[in-house]
């Protein structure tokens, strides 16, 4: 389990950083905060030099790096208004399941990047137990919940 102020892929709300409405949807329906407030991306370590100028490996979303201009338009929800992002660079040994998820995104979208924010609703603490996760999932507008090897989907 992570500790500290950042969700690092285990207790996270994740989303497609290529879709412009991802940030708006999470900010308005889950986090209930201003639409301009940014999220941090989780990125495959091997994508770091392709996507960022003057970056170094960093795993905790605490340092902002300037994204290369040619990628900003393709990843609008992964970058702040000033062209920077506070990424979590993920290596396989750090979190094998999350790494595989990012590798699959790269195969599908061409980018090993996911929007990542802590799994907590406005005014609540980050989920700590499976029960917390289910309660918050029921109380918000997320599509799916992946928990301990299970996939839970909302009924249509």
For each predicted feature, which ranges?
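Flexible beta->alpha loop and helix N-cap segments adjacent to enzyme active/binding sites
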Residues: 1-156
């Amino acid at each position: 389990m992570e500790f500290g102020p950042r969700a690092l892929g285990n207790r996270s709300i994740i989303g497609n950083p290529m879709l412009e409405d991802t940030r708006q949807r999470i900010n308005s329906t889950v986090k209930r905060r201003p639409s301009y407030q940014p999220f941090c991306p989780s990125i495959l370590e091997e994508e770091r030099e392709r996507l960022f100028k003057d970056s170094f490996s960093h795993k905790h979303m605490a340092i902002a790096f300037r994204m290369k201009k040619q990628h900003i338009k393709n990843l609008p929800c992964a970058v702040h208004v000033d062209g920077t992002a506070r990424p979590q660079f993920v290596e396989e040994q750090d979190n094998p399941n999350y790494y595989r998820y990012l590798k699959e995104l790269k195969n599908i979208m061409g980018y090993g990047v996911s929007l990542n924010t802590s799994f907590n609703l406005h005014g609540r603490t980050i989920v700590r137990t499976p029960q917390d996760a289910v309660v918050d999932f029921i109380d918000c507008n997320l599509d799916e919940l992946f928990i301990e090897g299970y996939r839970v989907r909302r009924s249509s």
